[in-house]
Amino acid sequence: MTDAAATPTQEYADIGGRADLEELLRTFYGRVLVDDVLSVPFTQVREVSGLDGHLPVMTDFWETVLFHAGLYRGSPLPVHLTVHDRTPLAGRHFARWLTTWVATVDEMFAGPVSHKAKTEAARFAWAMHRRLTGENNPELDAVVATARI
């Protein structure tokens, strides 16, 4: 018999700023770099710039998206085109990326900024997949539908 009052519930704070984003991204990329679907496309992160070179750029990106920090300039499309030329990205890559992102956010944070991080990630994944492949992605649509975003 389970006593609901005795079962601890974890309450998470919302993403509050750069330090939280750094922690989130380090955890997320730690998972992505060993994932059986995502590790190959992320080889360049691992081998060329390393995680320590990649994280500040991605932290700038997400801090700009979530907090309007104005730190990220440019477009992520050229980098993804290079990856796509080397390792063709398919719907499964974007669906796994989003699933991993949403799970990582949900395990670490909760609140309106966290929700925005998930909805923006879904929007970016859908748009990037469409730009790279010219196709819709039913698998990604299914992730969005089931991920409460």
Predicted regions span which residues?
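Core of compact, soluble alpha-helical bundle domains
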Residues: 1-149
